[in-house]
């Protein structure tokens, strides 16, 4: 429910300062009837004022027990202590000071006591020293500096760990690059020998196999086709590599017999794929203990087990750098496919 207003706007109520005649009418009515009934009091007392205005005029000015004059030191101390306890509840503070009104206490607090506390360095709201707050703010940068130092230390540790990881990754990628270049040269050399010899790779020094292909052709229909071969298990083993050139014979019935007889050849690059690096070792004026040659230090198994200590060797790194620089400009000539189409058919049968 909404409380009805104490005064009606259409009555033409008077506002502003009170006149002595109005004060006299209010005093005479309250002395006869006492306090209370403020909503109907103006009409009964013959005043064109609001009931609230009559109440405040009586409580703050016309009441006989109101204490006039300046506030004493005891009253100021009481106001400060009560304000610390109740805050801005002026009516509660006024009950602790007989003869003083809440409005008077509020005005005196805002115009005198509050400014005096601020000059003394006391917060008028919390009634605590203002310097305590500044001390806390001064302590904050020290804590922040400690946190910054610890974070910088952690960053240094993280950078050191990242550098170690990057070093390991760079070493691994470097060795993989070398291995890929060696494998590329070996594969190109073997493929060139296969194409040049006229047949696929068939045997090594460890095992020699003969590949025979028999094809029977009839003028009307194809009777039978059979082939058998045994490829080598390792293309890069140390030893002599054998190939099988193709020979063809025709019999009386029109059958074609294709026989691949084995022939051997030796490839220096296959027997020792790292031999071409020995020239660098011979040209360097370095002691035998500090010199690491690719042909003596690395082979098919040792290269994969190359340790990180080899990367740190200065002579080894110089030798390896020259090798890679030369390898970038090296071009291996390979016979075009269209010139060896018939031989590539045999290679496809072999690798298929």
Swiss-Prot record:
<dbReference type="InterPro" id="IPR001005">
    <property type="entry name" value="SANT/Myb"/>
</dbReference>
<dbReference type="GO" id="GO:0042742">
    <property type="term" value="P:defense response to bacterium"/>
</dbReference>
<keyword id="KW-0010">Activator</keyword>
<dbReference type="InterPro" id="IPR017930">
    <property type="entry name" value="Myb_dom"/>
</dbReference>
<dbReference type="GO" id="GO:0009682">
    <property type="term" value="P:induced systemic resistance"/>
</dbReference>
<feature type="domain" description="HTH myb-type 2">
    <location>
        <begin position="63"/>
        <end position="117"/>
    </location>
</feature>
<feature type="domain" description="HTH myb-type 1">
    <location>
        <begin position="10"/>
        <end position="62"/>
    </location>
</feature>
<dbReference type="GO" id="GO:0052544">
    <property type="term" value="P:defense response by callose deposition in cell wall"/>
</dbReference>
<protein>
    <recommendedName>
        <fullName>Transcription factor MYB51</fullName>
    </recommendedName>
</protein>
<dbReference type="GO" id="GO:0009617">
    <property type="term" value="P:response to bacterium"/>
</dbReference>
<feature type="region of interest" description="Disordered">
    <location>
        <begin position="198"/>
        <end position="219"/>
    </location>
</feature>
<dbReference type="Pfam" id="PF00249">
    <property type="entry name" value="Myb_DNA-binding"/>
</dbReference>
<comment type="subunit">
    <text>Can form complexes with MYC2, MYC3 or MYC4.</text>
</comment>
<feature type="DNA-binding region" description="H-T-H motif">
    <location>
        <begin position="90"/>
        <end position="113"/>
    </location>
</feature>
<keyword id="KW-0238">DNA-binding</keyword>
<dbReference type="GO" id="GO:0003700">
    <property type="term" value="F:DNA-binding transcription factor activity"/>
</dbReference>
<dbReference type="InterPro" id="IPR009057">
    <property type="entry name" value="Homeodomain-like_sf"/>
</dbReference>
<dbReference type="GO" id="GO:0005634">
    <property type="term" value="C:nucleus"/>
</dbReference>
<dbReference type="InterPro" id="IPR015495">
    <property type="entry name" value="Myb_TF_plants"/>
</dbReference>
<dbReference type="GO" id="GO:0009759">
    <property type="term" value="P:indole glucosinolate biosynthetic process"/>
</dbReference>
<dbReference type="GO" id="GO:0000976">
    <property type="term" value="F:transcription cis-regulatory region binding"/>
</dbReference>
<keyword id="KW-0539">Nucleus</keyword>
<keyword id="KW-0804">Transcription</keyword>
<keyword id="KW-0677">Repeat</keyword>
<feature type="region of interest" description="Disordered">
    <location>
        <begin position="128"/>
        <end position="157"/>
    </location>
</feature>
<dbReference type="GO" id="GO:0009625">
    <property type="term" value="P:response to insect"/>
</dbReference>
<comment type="function">
    <text>Transcription factor positively regulating indolic glucosinolate biosynthetic pathway genes.</text>
</comment>
<keyword id="KW-0805">Transcription regulation</keyword>
<feature type="compositionally biased region" description="Low complexity">
    <location>
        <begin position="203"/>
        <end position="219"/>
    </location>
</feature>
<feature type="DNA-binding region" description="H-T-H motif">
    <location>
        <begin position="38"/>
        <end position="62"/>
    </location>
</feature>
